[in-house]
Each structure stands twice: as C-alpha cells, then as structure tokens.
Amino acid sequence: MSEIVTYEDALKDFEPIIGLEVHVELSTQTKLFSSAPNIAGPLASCASQGPNTLVTPVCLGLPGSLPTVNERAVDYGIALGLALGCSIADELIFARKNYFYPDLPKNYQISQFDSPLAYDGKLEVETESGDVFFVEIERAHLEEDAGKLAHKSSTGRIQGAQYSLIDYNRSGVPLVEIVSRPVFADRCAPQVARAFVELIREIVLSLGVSNARLERGNIRCDANVSLRPRGLGAGILPNRTETKNLNSLRSIERAIRYEIQRQATLISSGELVRQETRHWREDRGITLSGRVKADSHEYRYFPEPDLLPIPIPSDKVEAIRLSMPEHPLALRRRLKAEWKFSDLQFRDVLNSSVLKQVDETVRAGATPDGAKKWWTGEITRIASQRRCNASDLISPEAVAEIELLISKGILNDSLARKVLAAVIDESLSVQQAIEKYDLSLTESASVERVLEKVLSENQEVVQKVISGKTQAVGVLVGSCMKTLGGKADASKLRQTILNRLLPR
C-alpha cells in the first residue's frame, strides 16, 4: 500500500460510515447458563483465579450437559435495554450460532438472532468538542462469552505461535451485545464512537450491571468502518472492515481514524477494500488483517433446542423500569443546572469521567467548584500516571473533608495536596495524614512573628512595595512561606502585607 493519506485528505472525497458492536460483561454471581462462578462477577476475579477453575460441564461443552438460564442476567439485560431507549421483547428466545474456534468448546455459541431481547433504541451522545449526535441502536441481545486463548508467540498472536493455551473460565460469562445502526457523523465519526462507548460505560455503571472496566475486557468494542464516495446514493453501503476487541476509549478513536485513512488510501489507488476483520496494534497505531468477515447466514443460526422460549411479562419490565436509577443523560442536565457550570466547565468533568465522583463529593459537603478542582485536576493526574480509574484512589467523602478544611483555613492547597497523596498512597484517613505529617497551617501568632522578621530583614523590598511596585510583594510572601514550610495561606499573607505597607 502506498503512503497513507492524511485524515483531512481522506474526508475530501469520502464519507465515513461506522457501526459499533459493544459487548458488556454482566457482573452476575454465576454464568449465563450454568452455576459456575462468573469471572466478571463478585464471586471471582480475573487476577486471583487459576485457569480452568471456574468451569462446569456446561462451560466445557461436555456431552449430556444442559443449560439453564440465569434470571438475574435477563433482568440486567432488560434494564440495560430500557436505559438504551429500546423496546423489550415479549419472549426471550435463544439461538445457536455455529462456528468452529478452539475457545468455543461446543462449536456453537448460545446467542440470539432474529428475536433480540431489546430493539429499536436511541442514544444522544456528545463529543468532547460539544457536538451532539443521535446514535440509533438496532438491537441489544444476550449471549454467552467464549473462552480465552493465549498464543505462545513473540507478539501474543496466533501467527508464528508454537502452541496455544485455552482458559475456559470466561466461557459462559453473560454478555449483552449492543449493535448500532450505521452512524453518519462525517469527520466526527471517531469522536462519536468514543462518546457512544463512554456513555454506555456510564449507563452500565449507574445500573450496577457490570464492572465496566475496558482494560479488563468488561466492555469490548468492535468498530465497523466503510467509506462511501461523496455524492454516491444514500442507500449504498460499501464493503466494511470490523476492527475487533478495542478495549480503551483512546483505541476506539484512533483505530477508526486510522481505518478511514487506510481505506481512503486503498480506494484512491484503485484497490478494493476487503470485507474482513482486523486487529488494532496500539504500539504501532495501525490495524492488521484478520480473517474474511462472515455474513450472518454463514453461522447457520437456528433456535436453541435445549431452551424453550421464556415469556417476559410486561409487569416485570415495568417493575425493572421503576427500580432503575436516574439516567446518566438526565443526571448530566440536572447537575449542570444545579452547579451553575458553564458548558466548558461541565465538559471538563465529563471528559475526565468523574461526574459521579464530583456529584458525591458535593453531596458530602464540598462546593461544586472545589469538588471539580480536585477530581479533574490532581486526582485525575495521579490516576492517569497509575493507569487506573480516579474512583479507585480516594473516596468522595475524603475529598469533601479536604476541601472543607481548606475553607476553614486549616489547610492550604499545597498542604492539601500532601494530605491527598498520603490518603491515596498509605490508605490513611484525612485526619491521620494531617497528624502523621503535621500538615495543618501554622497558628496566626507564629505567622505574625515570621512576618515581622521577614519585613525587617528585607527593607529594600519593603520600600519597593511602598513606592508602588506591588509585584515585589511576592518576594516577601515567598520568604514567609519558605520559613513556615508552606504552612500558611499565601493569598491571605499577601493581603496582610499589602494592608500593612499600603494603608488606606
């Protein structure tokens, strides 16, 4: 392939069309069709369980084993469907999706085909730049996950592997697959995809139906991309590629952007775009060819003979609807109005993915501005360095306590950052951190003594301030703060010096 065209050049002649398939692992205690502990649920964790220890005959596809449906997983699926604005089916009907792959022990996957659990939904998404798009949702259906392959090669991929290992702990984990209709967002397509998945993550977290950790595979996104020459009929959808298992918001955006550029380069040079699956290489910033993309008829779907259709009563759906928390979109609108934030301020909170944390910090007693300052600033910075979620570092109550101590004059921003670090690094309470490291502000009498000493020792600077060069007061403030070890309120100290040297 010739040198890849720029993103701007790709958009001159082609209109990108994307479609998204988002797989959400449900955090039920047991798997979808067996009593085995769910590796994505509260009874087990990916880090602590050995391979092939969370399995039953059903997970392994052993002859004679029969599936039974996990009712909690169905309830979670209904709640998620409602939150996506979908209609809910009258019956739960499973189907067999037939294909061969080593991580699929039965040689078929129990999924849904022409009768999904939820259908015809719509989500309003807002990109980081503030553009609003509506993404239509074709369906959301229940299915079981496959096992996990570990290829023993230098790249971790099957190419060049001497052998592969299979872990069936993930086999049978309940999934909801959310499938969008084609999205026409032009140049904003990568950002819309990112915002869509981010909103789904907010929704499943608010519902409590998934751990929603992309880096752990609790949410995985497959991105379909095709390019249509501008001016071509609206009903024409060219060959598409499907980039599989994108597991970070950044990867979703970058992979779609790259695929648009790659396809534009191919078409511009007279080559055809193969309808295939592709894999994203984060380290190289490119997609690599996988296998030819199968159409639905090649999976030979047919009704699951071991599971009869299960009625879904309307009163059950309504009961689930009434038990659901406030929708994240409604929450956003309400909090923005209550906090009196500008569009820019509120988008800063959304882009840092800390809306819930800021809300809980405000409810714990902090001001909206104070809560935002900590969660979008220092805490997000530390979380980014450690590659974890900000919510894993510190509780909203602790942040509110720190902010309250600042307002009372017991801490300043510098000392508060040290308290924050101690709380995060050593799992101390706020008071324990203050006492252990003696981090409260110095009493006013001590500050006054230091101030008198600094003024007497810096008469030249004092005269500059008196003569009107007020910027020189920073030297005096700095000397005081150095002597006090930073344990003073610099802004109050500055005002005190100005009041003393420039009396009205």
Swiss-Prot record:
GO BP term (any one): glutaminyl-tRNAGln biosynthesis via transamidation
Top enzyme class: ligase
Annotated SMART domains: GatB_Yqey (SM00845)
Species of origin: Tropheryma whipplei (strain TW08/27)
Alphabetized UniProt keyword annotations: ATP-binding, Ligase, Nucleotide-binding, Protein biosynthesis
Disulfide bond positions: none
Catalysed reaction equations from the record: L-glutamyl-tRNA(Gln) + L-glutamine + ATP + H2O = L-glutaminyl-tRNA(Gln) + L-glutamate + ADP + phosphate + H(+); L-aspartyl-tRNA(Asn) + L-glutamine + ATP + H2O = L-asparaginyl-tRNA(Asn) + L-glutamate + ADP + phosphate + 2 H(+)
Protein name: Aspartyl/glutamyl-tRNA(Asn/Gln) amidotransferase subunit B
UniProt key word Ligase: yes
Stated role: Allows the formation of correctly charged Asn-tRNA(Asn) or Gln-tRNA(Gln) through the transamidation of misacylated Asp-tRNA(Asn) or Glu-tRNA(Gln) in organisms which lack either or both of asparaginyl-tRNA or glutaminyl-tRNA synthetases. The reaction takes place in the presence of glutamine and ATP through an activated phospho-Asp-tRNA(Asn) or phospho-Glu-tRNA(Gln).
E.C. code: 6.3.5.-
Record keyword Disulfide bond present: no
InterPro entries with a match to the protein in the record: Asn/Gln-tRNA_amidoTrfase_suB/E, Asn/Gln-tRNA_Trfase_suB/E_cat, Asn/Gln_amidotransferase, Asn/Gln_tRNA_amidoTrase-B-like, GatB, GatB_Yqey_C_2, Gln-tRNA_amidoTrfase_suB_CS, Gln_synth/guanido_kin_cat_dom
